[in-house]
């Protein structure tokens, strides 16, 4: 569910993408009602990091002037997701970069960098299928990411690859090539690392099966 998805929905590689305004309480209640009696095995939530990440703290003041409750709403959404997953008795994670969730909600349960799970990506599948010019092969880049977890979530074993070296200015290749505030830039920077996603699936859903 995401507000970016088309209203008519779409299916790609077995994944159903549905439009939803996840900051609308009626929408959230409808989702909860729809899935409360279905066989759901795992939950993942990705609160809007631009409203929470400490990397964007310089813009918090201007955002608050436009909407004084912008951050409260973002934190409430993260907490609502955890509450939903708890009510369904399924393992879950709520993901964000280093952010104010640690102080306005609770401390993260786990931290990771994408390269620490790059070993789950095969050599013949090393290049990112959508953004190979920006995302390093086999997720070989650093980006400290926090996880708030529950209901028996298993943090997968790390199988790391060597991370790409930073440039002289301290930026990764991805950060060097990406700039601005476009939605595309935000999507690339916030893309869930493929290796980590596979590792989580293996540890929590497939239970080691391949």
Predicted feature descriptions by range:
Residues 31-35, 39, 49-209:
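Class I S-adenosyl-L-methionine
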């Amino acid at each position: 569910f995401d507000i970016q998805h088309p209203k008519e929905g779409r299916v790609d590689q077995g994944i159903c993408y549905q439009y939803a305004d996840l900051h609308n309480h009626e929408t959230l209640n409808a989702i909860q009602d729809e899935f409360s009696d279905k066989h759901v095995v795992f939950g993942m939530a990705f609160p809007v990091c631009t409203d929470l990440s400490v990397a964007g703290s310089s813009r918090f003041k201007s955002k608050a002037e436009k909407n004084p409750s912008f951050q409260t709403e973002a934190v409430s959404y993260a907490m609502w997701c955890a509450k939903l997953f708890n009510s369904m008795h399924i393992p879950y994670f709520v993901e964000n970069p280093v952010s104010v969730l640690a102080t306005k909600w609770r401390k993260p349960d786990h931290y990771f960098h994408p390269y620490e799970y790059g070993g789950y990506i095969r050599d013949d599948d090393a290049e990112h299928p959508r953004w190979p010019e920006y995302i390093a092969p086999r997720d070989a880049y650093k980006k400290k990411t926090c996880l708030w977890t529950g209901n028996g979530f298993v943090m997968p074993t790390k199988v790391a690859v060597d991370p790409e070296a930073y440039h002289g200015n301290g930026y990764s290749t991805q950060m060097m090539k990406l700039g601005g505030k476009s939605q595309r830039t935000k999507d690339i920077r916030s893309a869930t690392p493929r290796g980590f996603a596979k590792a989580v699936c293996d540890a929590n859903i497939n239970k080691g099966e391949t």
